[in-house]
Amino acid sequence: MIKVAINGICGRMGTRIAELVTEDKNLILVAAVENQKHQNIGKDLGQILKKELRGVVISHELREKPDVLIDFSSPDSTVERLKTCTENRIATVIGTTGLNMKQKECVKKATEKIACLFSPNMSIGVNQLF
């Protein structure tokens, strides 16, 4: 079973990915991460997904060690989580948009140490050209 964490859990993409992860028997959601000032910090993810409570509490910190972090957050949050992922050898999928050149350089540097997919536009057509 693959352990998954999602950064940006309360956004549209984060919520949708969480729904898909919870429906897949080969995946287990172990961490739900969001901006520290978000109103849902401390709530069980089940409240957000409107499903039975799952025991995954929304936090600002990545407390669990997942196999992969899926990130659809903000540029600053992405870079912060990427440092944690690099230090702990956690594979990362980044779909965050709006990264500046310095932040993109952090992503590039991380790829030297961990598996990292960076695609700020996840549409099939764009990724065939990317």
Spans of features found by a protein language model:
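NAD(P)-binding Rossmann-fold cofactor-contacting core
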Residues: E23-L49
